[in-house]
Amino acid sequence: MKALLRALIGQGIEALRANGTLPGDTLPPDFVVERPKTREHGDFATNAAMLLAKAARSNPRALAQALLTALPDSNDVTKVEIAGPGFINFHLAPTAYQREVAHVIKQGHDYGRGLAGNGRSVGVEYVSANPTGPLHVGHGRAAAIGDSLARVLDANGWNVKREFYYNDAGVQIENLALSVQARAQGLTPDSAGWPENGYRGDYIADVANAYLAGDTVDMEGHLVTGTKDPADLESIRRFAVAYLRNEQNHDLAAFRVDFDIYFLESSLYKDGKVEEAVQKLIASGHTYEEGGALWLKSTDFGDDKDRVMRKSDGTYTYFVPDVAYHLTKWQRGYERAITELGADHHGSLTRVRAGLQAMELGIPQGWPEYVLHQMVTVMRDGEEVKLGKRAGGYVTLRDLIEETSADAVRWFLIARKPDSQLTFDIDLARAQSNDNPVFYVQYAHARVCSVLRQAQEKGYKYDQVHGLAELARLDDEHSLAVMLELSRYPEVVEIAGQTLEPYQIAQYLRELAHAFHTWYHNSKVLVDDAAERDAKLTLAVATQQVLANGLELLGVSAPEKM
């Protein structure tokens, strides 16, 4: 619909150039066509006249009137009016929305998919949990947001690579190995000899028992076997990391989350990428030595203070491998790099960008982009869920999926802005009622499937071509409300991709489901008149298609029965 109006406005601008209202060399401005906040102001509005007023040396409202007069006639536009300082509002005819139903039917699964990315490359990194324990609900929110964001970007024409970064070279891994070793030697977290910074969750005992039993773990095709020797710390380290990575992969698979690339922090050291990044920074002239340490002049690039890169003992601070890792993303050809992180990591944003800018390699400012999510509180029976002992103080993603469903967990972890704190209500997520948004949306899809089955049981032969030809019959308030929502879907997908906010898809699906349920309750679908029945079934099938398309972007199933 926007394309139709942009074409009409473009023709109007050409007419104003032809009659001298606009100078002949006036270029069409980058005007917007958008939906007003309220329907009283029409279906769409444009600011074209306000942008052209200076070139025409005219009052914006006066130019808006001239542009309005110059617009060609269209059967899809019933009224055009001027509002405010020079906006032009368009009211569309039912035929415009009825035609959109035909577009949904014709394009099917591709309806709503766009070409904004034009095949350009984008790397989306998310979850990136340390392989030191089970995935908790915070990791789950990262997984849901990151995976849905990757799906939305793919729907917008980007060549998306999904990436998981394993921090397998830090002090946490050493603490993990020492904790498993202590368990293997018969100690408990309350024992006097327990490691000072050891992990206390019951899962550590599971790892130790598997190691002592000589179990073999498949870590993405590499088999790692426990040697049963509690004194072999290096063997314990390898086995524990493999065991917990395997556990995390199991949970992510159950959550319908997968990755194209698993990148190990340890490979940065093994392949010399950390040293390469350090040498590039030294060569750039943005480093200095002080107190036996190597510093980055990160204040030259927006940081609040300079940062130590290499400590006096020769070891690197944690942000250096982060810079090296993101340098590899640039070297791998990502035009965009997007990292989804917990909000507690916000301090690393500026220093990583500063390190990349200091290399003077032409990396754009603001690269990489970040999406930060806030914490999740889990509630049951109106009370906060006690932290799980097995995970050592966290509610695990696995527990949530088992108590509710992958669909419910994904929906609720996506459905609010990432930067807002989220309360996950287990009782609501399990409820089969209209108060549960994922149930409400999925039921709309299942309801269409049910109507189609009923039509078949009654012996009605649904003729979709006939239904498309008879859509003009559906000009009542509730039918048009559904059509309007269907027409919004491509815009919502595009905006969600631009803003990196997949929650907008969830909000939209609730609104579409509401319009559909309202229409269904106010309009008998399986009527005797074949023309009217086919038209209504066609509208229902179009709704079913858009619901399925949107749910797929969220990684939520579209059930046929409920």
UniProtKB/Swiss-Prot annotation:
<dbReference type="GO" id="GO:0005524">
    <property type="term" value="F:ATP binding"/>
</dbReference>
<keyword id="KW-0547">Nucleotide-binding</keyword>
<keyword id="KW-0067">ATP-binding</keyword>
<keyword id="KW-0648">Protein biosynthesis</keyword>
<dbReference type="GO" id="GO:0006420">
    <property type="term" value="P:arginyl-tRNA aminoacylation"/>
</dbReference>
<dbReference type="InterPro" id="IPR009080">
    <property type="entry name" value="tRNAsynth_Ia_anticodon-bd"/>
</dbReference>
<feature type="short sequence motif" description="'HIGH' region">
    <location>
        <begin position="129"/>
        <end position="139"/>
    </location>
</feature>
<dbReference type="Pfam" id="PF00750">
    <property type="entry name" value="tRNA-synt_1d"/>
</dbReference>
<dbReference type="GO" id="GO:0005737">
    <property type="term" value="C:cytoplasm"/>
</dbReference>
<dbReference type="GO" id="GO:0004814">
    <property type="term" value="F:arginine-tRNA ligase activity"/>
</dbReference>
<comment type="subunit">
    <text>Monomer.</text>
</comment>
<dbReference type="InterPro" id="IPR036695">
    <property type="entry name" value="Arg-tRNA-synth_N_sf"/>
</dbReference>
<keyword id="KW-0436">Ligase</keyword>
<dbReference type="Pfam" id="PF03485">
    <property type="entry name" value="Arg_tRNA_synt_N"/>
</dbReference>
<comment type="similarity">
    <text>Belongs to the class-I aminoacyl-tRNA synthetase family.</text>
</comment>
<protein>
    <recommendedName>
        <fullName>Arginine--tRNA ligase</fullName>
        <ecNumber>6.1.1.19</ecNumber>
    </recommendedName>
</protein>
<keyword id="KW-0030">Aminoacyl-tRNA synthetase</keyword>
<keyword id="KW-0963">Cytoplasm</keyword>
<dbReference type="InterPro" id="IPR001278">
    <property type="entry name" value="Arg-tRNA-ligase"/>
</dbReference>
<dbReference type="InterPro" id="IPR001412">
    <property type="entry name" value="aa-tRNA-synth_I_CS"/>
</dbReference>
<dbReference type="InterPro" id="IPR035684">
    <property type="entry name" value="ArgRS_core"/>
</dbReference>
<dbReference type="InterPro" id="IPR005148">
    <property type="entry name" value="Arg-tRNA-synth_N"/>
</dbReference>
<dbReference type="InterPro" id="IPR014729">
    <property type="entry name" value="Rossmann-like_a/b/a_fold"/>
</dbReference>
<dbReference type="Pfam" id="PF05746">
    <property type="entry name" value="DALR_1"/>
</dbReference>
<dbReference type="InterPro" id="IPR008909">
    <property type="entry name" value="DALR_anticod-bd"/>
</dbReference>
